[in-house]
């Protein structure tokens, strides 16, 4: 699956009163866009990556979030649910960090006491982790690594399909989720919002490694 548009990196920092980007000269290739309600916006000139920096002095922790402006609306009939499955695959390992080497993304996050998760929606997919603030650089390195070097293997897809199928069944057994799914399918008949972010069962079951790549 080809990622569309440029992602946004969001950092909620709880370190010093002034963040490094604010108090020091900007690194080459980073431009300041604006300041709004205490939020600093930057842009990486080489690829358009947006950066939002939100300092918070309350606790010695930080949250790093990467949001890709692609979601289930970018899917077509036959590939619905692929974005959500790819979200799951993002935790399975990369060329550099993988279970075969003994340290994949999840194990690295656990080692530093971080809590990581992700969500998929119609217009975006986001990945986030909260950790002690001294590990922000490591979290960003891991995000950059899986952005570029994700391993999408048959065995990993097979294991995640069980997880995704169980998630799908929970939704089918929820009256509220079923109502919302039918509402969107009726209201957006000629629009990609008509299919749920988790996808249709037949499409989920036929998802292949080639499609995800």
PLM feature spans:
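Buried hydrophobic packing residues in well-ordered domains
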Residues: 48, 66, 84-86, 127, ...
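M16/MPP (pitrilysin/insulinase) zinc-metallopeptidase core fold and M16-derived inactive scaffolds
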Residues: 63-130, 173, 194-198
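Mature N-terminal segment immediately following signal peptide/propeptide cleavage
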Residues: 28-67
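M16/insulysin-pitrilysin zinc metalloprotease superfamily fold
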Residues: 95-96, 130-161
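Scaffold signal of the M16-like zinc-metallopeptidase fold and its non-catalytic homologs
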Residues: 21-22, 93-94, 139, 146, ...
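Acidic/histidine-enriched alpha-helical segments
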Residues: 102, 110, 151-169
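Boundary at the C-terminal end of the N-terminal hydrophobic targeting segment
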Residues: 15-25
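Bacterial N-terminal signal peptides
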Residues: 5-17
């Amino acid at each position: 699956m080809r990622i569309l548009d440029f992602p946004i990196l969001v950092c909620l920092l709880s370190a010093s009163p002034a963040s490094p980007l604010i108090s020091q000269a900007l690194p080459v290739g980073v431009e300041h866009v604006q300041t709004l309600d205490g939020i600093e916006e930057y842009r990486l000139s080489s690829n358009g990556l947006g950066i939002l920096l939100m300092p918070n002095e309350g606790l010695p922790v930080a949250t790093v979030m990467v949001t890709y402006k692609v979601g289930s609306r970018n899917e077509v009939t036959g590939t619905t649910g692929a974005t959500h499955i790819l979200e799951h695959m993002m935790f399975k390992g990369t060329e550099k960090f993988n279970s075969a080497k003994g340290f994949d993304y999840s194990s690295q996050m656990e080692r530093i006491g971080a809590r990581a998760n992700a969500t998929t929606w119609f217009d975006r997919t986001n990945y986030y982790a909260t950790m002690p603030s001294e590990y922000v650089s490591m979290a960003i390195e891991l995000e950059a690594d899986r952005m570029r070097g994700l391993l999408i293997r048959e065995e990993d897809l097979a294991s995640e399909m069980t997880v995704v199928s169980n998630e799908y069944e929970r939704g089918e057994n929820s009256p509220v989720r079923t109502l919302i799914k039918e509402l969107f399918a009726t209201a957006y008949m000629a629009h990609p919002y008509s299919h749920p972010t988790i996808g249709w069962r037949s499409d989920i079951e036929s998802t292949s490694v080639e499609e995800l790549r």
